[in-house]
């Protein structure tokens, strides 16, 4: 069952986190510019329900939740809920008649991927992380084509390494020469995600105060929802108002990346890919509770290239953080070289590569 009109159509499945949604949006925008009709499959409770319509794409919802780590009752009920969600996805596919289905992670990808194959529609998978999620591990066995961002991601199936699709404006930023002006102050961008990172919020005020005694440092700190007053108050208590900007959430990450000399952050797949494409040095603190510790493996891509320092959270303290920042503040040549080494592993054409695979398979359907 395929679309009988001349207009090519793609159903994209991605949701739950920005690490799934934003790469998928990059592909959606690329194909939309090529004249494709794009539709989304997600869940009503997750971030895709808000983000996808904001970017001008229609979205359908199915009723599905994750089961890993949940109670016995939910696990026993899970097979019946999955069957229902597969049926819901098949209804969407029958109505939309896509030429190809692209799964990029999130709860909807599992039922949607199965529904695509049952409907005879080519299924393309893209895995953003260095360790695949459970859904993509399962779907990789029935997919028409498996794509991934990093080498050695899949053991059991052959996957093409294409990188992670990132926003056009960030790719352009990576092609723009850094300001060669005076660099008296080390500009540190601190990003802990939309909810912030407690470890960054706890440590950075003291780190900044101690660093300021011997080095010039300026901080732009995203503290996360609900943390603004407490973290800002601590910076103020330490007399750092003039050298620190504190925000609950940074809307313009392009501006933040352009401003920064170094980034202190988690090592989600999209973040790692953005840092590499732009060529930004980083201090990476993997989220210690990530499934299968995949953020540590993501980080290794930049660490092995020499573009980042790895700082595991269980051993992270004020002294270790100050030590790394002092190295970068004192040796600007090393800072610049770290940026170049990060850029050496960046992939800037991932969006086109993913889109090209979808176009090719749609032509065969």
UniProtKB/Swiss-Prot annotation:
Domain of life of the source: Bacteria
Keyword Membrane among UniProt keywords: yes
Regions crossing the membrane: none
Enzyme class (EC, first level): transferase
Pfam annotation, one family: Glyco_tran_28_C
Keyword Nuclease applies: no
Any GO molecular function: UDP-N-acetyl-D-glucosamine:N-acetylmuramoyl-L-alanyl-D-glutamyl-meso-2,6-diaminopimelyl-D-alanyl-D-alanine-diphosphoundecaprenol 4-beta-N-acetylglucosaminlytransferase activity
Residues reported in the UniProt entry to bind UDP-N-acetyl-alpha-D-glucosamine: 17-19, 129, 167, 194, 250, 269-274, 295
Membrane topology label: Peripheral membrane protein
Keywords: Cell cycle, Cell division, Cell inner membrane, Cell membrane, Cell shape, Cell wall biogenesis/degradation, Glycosyltransferase, Membrane, Peptidoglycan synthesis, Transferase
Localization, UniProt: Cell inner membrane
A GO-annotated cellular component: plasma membrane
Gene Ontology terms describing biological process: carbohydrate metabolic process; cell division; cell wall organization; lipid glycosylation; peptidoglycan biosynthetic process; regulation of cell shape
E.C. code: 2.4.1.227
Reactions mediated catalytically: di-trans,octa-cis-undecaprenyl diphospho-N-acetyl-alpha-D-muramoyl-L-alanyl-D-glutamyl-meso-2,6-diaminopimeloyl-D-alanyl-D-alanine + UDP-N-acetyl-alpha-D-glucosamine = di-trans,octa-cis-undecaprenyl diphospho-[N-acetyl-alpha-D-glucosaminyl-(1->4)]-N-acetyl-alpha-D-muramoyl-L-alanyl-D-glutamyl-meso-2,6-diaminopimeloyl-D-alanyl-D-alanine + UDP + H(+)
Chief location of this protein within or outside the cell: membrane
Pathway: Cell wall biogenesis; peptidoglycan biosynthesis
Job description of the protein: Cell wall formation. Catalyzes the transfer of a GlcNAc subunit on undecaprenyl-pyrophosphoryl-MurNAc-pentapeptide (lipid intermediate I) to form undecaprenyl-pyrophosphoryl-MurNAc-(pentapeptide)GlcNAc (lipid intermediate II).
Alphabetical list of HAMAP family matching this protein: MurG
Annotated family: Belongs to the glycosyltransferase 28 family. MurG subfamily.
Name by which UniProt lists this protein: UDP-N-acetylglucosamine--N-acetylmuramyl-(pentapeptide) pyrophosphoryl-undecaprenol N-acetylglucosamine transferase
Source species: Shewanella woodyi (strain ATCC 51908 / MS32)
The gene coding this protein: murG
């Amino acid at each position: 069952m395929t679309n009988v009109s001349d207009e090519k159509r793609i159903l994209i499945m991605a949701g739950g986190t920005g690490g799934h949604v934003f790469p998928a949006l990059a592909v959606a925008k690329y194909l939309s510019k090529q004249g494709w009709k794009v539709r989304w499959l997600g869940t009503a409770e997750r971030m895709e329900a808000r983000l996808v319509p904001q970017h001008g794409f229609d979205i359908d919802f199915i009723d599905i939740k994750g089961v890993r780590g949940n109670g016995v009752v939910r696990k026993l009920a899970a097979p019946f809920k999955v069957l229902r969600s597969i049926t819901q996805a098949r209804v969407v596919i029958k109505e939309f008649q896509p030429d190809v289905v692209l799964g990029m992670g999130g709860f909807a990808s599992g039922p949607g991927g199965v529904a695509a194959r049952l409907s005879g529609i080519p299924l393309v998978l893209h895995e953003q992380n260095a360790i695949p999620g459970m859904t993509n591990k399962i779907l990789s066995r029935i997919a028409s084509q498996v794509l991934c961002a990093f080498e050695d991601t899949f053991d059991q199936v052959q996957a093409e390494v294409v990188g992670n699709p990132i926003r056009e404006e960030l790719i352009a930023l990576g092609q723009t020469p850094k300001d060669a002006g005076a660099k008296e102050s080390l500009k540190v961008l601190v990003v802990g995600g939309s909810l912030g990172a407690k470890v960054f919020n706890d440590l950075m005020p003291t780190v900044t105060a101690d660093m300021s005694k011997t080095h010039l440092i300026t901080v732009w700190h995203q503290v996360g929802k609900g943390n603004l007053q407490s973290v800002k108050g601590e910076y103020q208590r330490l007399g750092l108002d003039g050298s620190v900007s504190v925000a609950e959430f940074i809307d313009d990450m392009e501006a933040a990346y352009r401003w920064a000399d170094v980034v202190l952050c988690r090592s989600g797949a999209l973040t790692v890919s953005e840092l590499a494409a732009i060529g930004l040095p980083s201090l990476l603190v993997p989220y210690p509770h990530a499934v299968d510790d995949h953020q540590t493996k993501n980080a290794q891509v930049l660490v092995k290239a020499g573009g980042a320092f790895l700082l595991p959270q269980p051993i992270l303290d004020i002294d270790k953080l100050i030590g790394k920042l002092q190295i970068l503040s004192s040796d600007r040549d090393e800072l610049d070289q770290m940026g170049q080494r990060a850029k050496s592993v960046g992939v800037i054409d991932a969006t086109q590569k993913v889109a090209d695979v979808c176009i090719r398979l749609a032509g065969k359907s």
